[in-house]
Amino acid sequence: MKKARILLADDHPHLVEKVTQLLQPEYEVLGAVSDGQALVSAAERLKPDVLVLDVTMPILDGIEAAKKLKAQGCESKIVFLTVHSDPDYLRACLAAGGLGYVSKSRMASDLLHAVHHALTERIFISPTMTGQK
């Protein structure tokens, strides 16, 4: 079976390295970009199955980049990886087409679940983001 292809977007190289190590055994990580505009360009060119992106990035934030991609007909599933626990960010990410909203503090336990859910068109939100434990 072919591995799902993932593109990462985060402006912290150390975090990109950790995410890659976490995802690589199960998925094909195509690469990483460090800002929202580069994400839009790379997603158009590479057509990944899933985008794992940070909310707060330079040039174009993750929410705006997701909106732009969806408006252009991008079919990639979107999983946000973030430090923001504010419900307004969660709502904005879901409204922008996100199927996953993962706390960076729970990345090791939640990210694989979120990607799997996104690939099957289901929403996954880290329990800490919804006030659960």
Give the residues covered by each predicted segment:
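Conserved sequence signature across two-component system core domains
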Residues: 9-10, 33, 51
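Two-component/phosphorelay signaling modules centered on CheY-like receiver
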Residues: 13-31
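Acidic catalytic/metal-coordinating carboxylates
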Residues: 35-38, 61-64
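Conserved phosphotransfer cores of two-component systems
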Residues: 44-46, 68-75, 96
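Active-site beta3 strand of CheY-like receiver
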Residues: 46-52
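Active-site residues of response regulator receiver
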Residues: 54, 82
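Receiver (REC) domain active-site loop signature in two-component systems and cognate sites
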Residues: 57
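Short, flexible helix-to-coil linker/hinge segments that flank and couple to helix-turn-helix
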Residues: 90-95, 99-133
